UniProtKB/Swiss-Prot annotation:
Family that this chain belongs to: Belongs to the TRAFAC class TrmE-Era-EngA-EngB-Septin-like GTPase superfamily. EngA (Der) GTPase family.
Residues given in the record as GTP 1 binding sites: 9-16, 56-60, 118-121
Pfam families for the chain: KH_dom-like (PF14714), MMR_HSR1 (PF01926)
Binding positions (GTP 2): 190-197, 237-241, 302-305
Domain EngA-type G: 3-166, 184-358
Protein name: GTPase Der
InterPro entries: G_ENGA (IPR031166), GTP-bd (IPR006073), GTPase_Der (IPR016484), KH_dom-like (IPR032859), KH_dom-like_a/b (IPR015946), P-loop_NTPase (IPR027417), Small_GTP-bd (IPR005225)
SUPFAM superfamilies: P-loop containing nucleoside triphosphate hydrolases (SSF52540)
Positions of the UniProt region annotated as Disordered: 446-465
Taxonomic superkingdom: Bacteria
Length: 465
C-alpha cells in the first residue's frame, strides 16, 4: 500500500498544477468525469525510488450542495486516507473565507498538514506567507507551481522524512503480513455493478457480500480468506470505480483510493468488465495501473449469458482493439458470475499467473535465454558499434525482474526491448504476469588501469622534455 499525499484547497489555487509537477502529468491516472474543476485525479509519483500516490481532490467550498456536496465528501475521504496533506492557497489573492473553511475542516483531522502558498512569483515570499500562519498549522511554505519554483524544496523538506519513515514501518508490517498471508491474495477490481460482489459470492459458494442491483452497494473493500481444492486464497472485493456524472446518492462511497491500494497489496488482480457496457476508460486506467505496479492480471468479462452471437462477436472485437497490449499474455474469460459459467477457469488463470509471477529463474538460465535471443536477432548498430548484451540475472519476482548488463544499453530501442520480453515470455511460458527488464551499463574493469597508464605516460613525457 502506497504512501498517500492529498492536495486540497478551494478552487483555482493551483492544485492541479502542483499535482502535475509531482506526478509528471503524463503518469496521471485520470478518470474521464464531467467537469474539469470537479475531477479528482490520481497519480503515481516517485521520490528517491520510493513510490507514492497523489490525489488532487478538486475544490472544496462551504456552499457545496447536491453533486458538489458529494464531491466535498469524497475530498474528505481522501483526506482521511492521506498520510500527508498539502493545503494549497493563493499567495496573490491572500487569505479568503474559502481558505478559512478548508482550514477548519483540516483542523478537525489528526493529519500532517503543510500550507502551500502558491503563486508567489514576483512577490515577497515571507510577506505572502505571513497571514496564513493564522490557520494554526506550523508548516507553511511558498512555491510557484507553474514555474516549478521551490517545488523540489517542498518535497525535500516535507515529504522525504515521513515517506522514509512510512516505508520503514511498512516494510516490517508487510514482511509480517507475508508470513501471515492466507495463500494467494487477489483482488476483484472494476466499475460498480459489473458483478464483482456476485463473482465474490460465486467463488466463495456463499452470500458473504451484500449484493443489490444498484451501483455501489459494496460500501468498502471486503477481505475474505477461503480455501478451494486445497489451495488457500484471500479475495478482496473493492468498492467499484464509477463514472462521476452518474453519481446521484451521497451515501455511495466512491473509493478509487481503496481500489488502487488493493491493487498494490494483491498478488493477482482480476479485472471485471461488464460485457454489455463494454470496456471503458476507467477500466483501462485501472488495468494500466495494475500493470505499472507489476501485478499479475486476469480479465473476467461478466454477464456473457443472454447475449446474442452478434453482440458477442462485437464485444470480442472491441476487447481486441482496446486491449491489444494484453493479447500476448493475459487470459480473458467470458463468464456469468450469476450462473457460475467459466468461473472455474478464472481460478485456473489466477493460479497460473501467481505461479509465473513467482517462478524462480537462475542466473545461468537468464543469461542463456538472453544469448539465444541475441543469436536469433542481434541488437542494432549504434554508429560504428553494435550494442552488446553480456549477461543477465534475476533482480526479483512478483513481478519477475530480469537485469541485463552490457555496453550502450541506454541506446537500446523499445522495439528490441519488446522483442526480448516476448522471447523470454515464450521460452519461460509466462502467463498473466508482466516481465520487468532493467538494463545496466557494464563497468570497464580496465578503466582505472587505463587512466593510471595515461597519467604515467604524461609524467614520463614531461620528464623527457
Amino acid at each position: 500500500m502506497s504512501f498517500l499525499v492529498a492536495i486540497v484547497g478551494r478552487a483555482n489555487v493551483g492544485k492541479s498544477t502542483l499535482f502535475n509537477v509531482l506526478t509528471n502529468s503524463h503518469d496521471a491516472l485520470v478518470f474521464d468525469f464531467e467537469g474539469v474543476t470537479r475531477d479528482r485525479q490520481y497519480g503515481q509519483a516517485k521520490y528517491d525510488d520510493l513510490d507514492y500516490l497523489v490525489v488532487d481532490t478538486g475544490g472544496i467550498s462551504d456552499k457545496d450542495v447536491g453533486f458538489d456536496e458529494f464531491m466535498a465528501k469524497q475530498s474528505q475521504i481522501a483526506i482521511d486516507e492521506a498520510n500527508l496533506v498539502f493545503f494549497v492557497v493563493d499567495g496573490r489573492s491572500g487569505l479568503t473565507t474559502g481558505d478559512e473553511y478548508v482550514a477548519s475542516l483540516l483542523r478537525q483531522k489528526d493529519k500532517k498538514v503543510v500550507v502551500v502558498v502558491n503563486k508567489v512569483d514576483g512577490t515577497d515570499e515571507e510577506a505572502a506567507m505571513a497571514e496564513f500562519y493564522s490557520f494554526g498549522f506550523d508548516k507553511v511554505f511558498a512555491i510557484s507551481a507553474a514555474h516549478r519554483r521551490n517545488t523540489q524544496k517542498l518535497v525535500d523538506k516535507f515529504l522525504k522524512k515521513p515517506l522514509n519513515e512510512y516505508y520503514q514501518d511498512y516494510t516490517q508490517t508487510q514482511e509480517h503480513k507475508e508470513q501471515q498471508r492466507h495463500g494467494i491474495h487477489f483482488s476483484l477490481i472494476g466499475r460498480p455493478n459489473v458483478g464483482k460482489s456476485t463473482l465474490t459470492n460465486r467463488m466463495l459458494g456463499e452470500d458473504r457480500v451484500v449484493v443489490f442491483d444498484m451501483p455501489g452497494t459494496t460500501i468498502d473493500s471486503v477481505s475474505i480468506p477461503f480455501e478451494r481444492h486445497g489451495q488457500k486464497y484471500t479475495i478482496v472485493d473493492t468498492a467499484g470505480v464509477r463514472k462521476r456524472g452518474k453519481v446521484k446518492q451521497t451515501l455511495e462511497k466512491f473509493s478509487v483510493i481503496k481500489t488502487l491500494q488493493a491493487i498494490q497489496d494483491s498478488n493477482v488482480v482480476v479485472a471485471v468488465v461488464d460485457a454489455r457496457q463494454g470496456i471503458s476508460d476507467q477500466d483501462l486506467s485501472l488495468i494500466h495501473f495494475a500493470i505499472k505496479n507489476g501485478r499479475a492480471l486476469v480479465l473476467a468479462v461478466n454477464k456473457w449469458d443472454g447475449m446474442t452471437e452478434e453482440d458477442r462477436i462485437q464485444v470480442k472485437q472491441d476487447l481486441k482493439r482496446k486491449l491489444f497490449f494484453l493479447q500476448d499474455y493475459v487470459d480473458i474469460h467470458f463468464i456469468s458470475a450469476l450462473h457460475g459459467t467459466n468461473v472455474g477457469h478464472v481460478f485456473e488463470s489466477i493460479d497460473t499467473a501467481y505461479a509465473c509471477a513467482n517462478k524462480k529463474i537462475t542466473t545461468a538460465d537468464a543469461t542463456r535465454l538472453m544469448q539465444l535471443a541475441v543469436e536469433a536477432h542481434s541488437p542494432p548498430m549504434v554508429g560504428k558499434f553494435r550494442i552488446k548484451l553480456k549477461y543477465a540475472h534475476v533482480g526479483g519476482h512478483n513481478p519477475p525482474v530480469i537485469v541485463i548488463h552490457g555496453n550502450q544499453v541506454s541506446r537500446l530501442p523499445n522495439s528490441y526491448k519488446r522483442y526480448l520480453e516476448n522471447f523470454f515470455r515464450e521460452a519461460l511460458d509466462f502467463r498473466g504476469t508482466p516481465i520487468v527488464f532493467e538494463f545496466k551499463q557494464s563497468e570497464n574493469p580496465f578503466a582505472d588501469r587505463k587512466n593510471k597508464r595515461s597519467k604515467d605516460e604524461g609524467s614520463k613525457s614531461k620528464k623527457v622534455k
